[in-house]
Regions:
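Hydrophobic/aromatic side-chain positions at a characteristic register within alpha-helices
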Residues: 262-266, 293-296
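Ankyrin repeat domain, specifically the short helix-to-loop turn at the C-terminus of the second helix
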Residues: 241-245, 273-280, 303-311
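Alpha-helical oligomerization segments
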Residues: 283-322
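Ankyrin repeat structural motif
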Residues: 49, 98, 267-275, 297-306
Length: 322
């Protein structure tokens, strides 16, 4: 068995792909932070197979495989899909197989590059903890993001490196049985489905994405609208003046609740940015201070008290600086 020193304890089952790269067919690990290898013996990993990290073992009968041990000096792992919290895919991976992360119930983050063009059905089934996708790609370029979002109906925070940050809200899809004919009618609840349609040929259409804010407001999903707004304003990639004004208006009306949530969670960077926009009233800041005190978030409280002091300073405008 080939043994490679790295930062993880992994047991890999691999094969040669038709393109000449390496197909990673199975990865067994107990690690919470998993970085799949970019290459093995100088050959790039180009395929991530079906059920590769899932709870279920893939059927590899009849395949010509070889084993690779990735180690940082520990013992050989016994696979535990529930232990996995973050996964970084190989930088040259072109495809992710069906059910790749099936039943990885505690998976919170996936990191991948724009080389991935295929994202298999069921790849994120039962990944109920997934919250973040980091995509190393240009925000305006075609990527696998539409396929990935199509596999996950929950709320997702998506980052294109440092170039753009977006929130895709959740939605719920259900089939209603129209008895006695037993005709099933598809019903979709939540604005997240509309946000997932904002793509042209695999590339995100930012104009459509920003226009989808109106549906959130019509649905009175104000807390979600505030979270969408603060992300777009923080990293304003191709943000029009009109869309910027709409997002600022949302935060003037509903930013107070967001500030309280950030204060309770101790998210000082988010609080500092929100304060810098000048959208919070004195009452909003006071309420956030109360939330920080109750949660014993002293750093967040310090940020808020400093801002409250600035708003009360004689002759100072009600705005905040980073």
């Amino acid at each position: 068995m080939r043994v490679i020193e790295s930062e993880n304890e992994l047991r890999l089952t691999c094969s040669r792909s038709a393109s000449g790269g390496i197909a990673l067919l199975r990865c067994e690990t107990q690690d919470d932070i998993v970085r799949l290898p970019d290459e093995i013996d100088g050959v790039p990993v180009t395929e991530v197979g079906a059920y590769v990290l899932s709870e279920r073992v893939p059927d590899l009968t009849g395949k010509d495989t070889f084993a690779v041990r990735i180690t940082c000096g520990g013992t050989e792992p016994k696979h535990n899909a529930a232990a996995i919290r973050t996964v970084t895919l190989p930088k040259d991976a072109k495809s992710v197989g069906s059910y790749a992360f099936y039943n990885c119930r505690n998976l919170e983050r996936i990191e991948l590059t724009d080389s991935v063009s295929e994202f298999g059905g069921g790849a994120l089934m039962n990944c109920m903890s997934l919250r973040e996708v980091i995509l190393h790609a240009a925000p305006s370029a075609p990527t696998c993001l539409p396929r990935l979002l199509g596999e996950y109906a929950g709320e997702l925070d998506v980052r294109f490196d440092e170039h753009a940050r977006l929130l895709f809200p959740e939605y719920v899809e259900e089939l209603e049985d129209l008895s006695p004919a037993h005709i099933f009618q598809r019903r979709i609840h939540g604005a997240g489905y509309s946000y997932r349609q904002c793509f042209d040929g695999g590339a995100l259409n930012f104009r459509q994405y920003d226009a989808a804010l109106s549906e959130l407001l019509e649905r009175h999903d104000f807390s979600v609208a505030a979270r969408v707004a603060v992300r777009r304003l923080a990293v304003p990639f191709v943000l029009s003046d009109a869309a910027k004004a709409d997002y600022l208006a949302v935060l003037r009306t509903h930013g107070g609740n967001l500030a309280q949530s950030c204060a309770k969670a101790g998210e000082t960077a988010a609080l500092t940015f929100l304060l810098s926009l000048g959208v919070l009233s004195a009452a909003d800041v006071d309420a956030a201070c109360t939330s920080a005190r109750e949660a014993e978030q002293t750093a967040a409280l310090s940020v808020l008290l400093s801002a409250a002091g600035k708003t009360q300073s004689k002759g100072r405008a009600k705005s905040f600086e980073l």
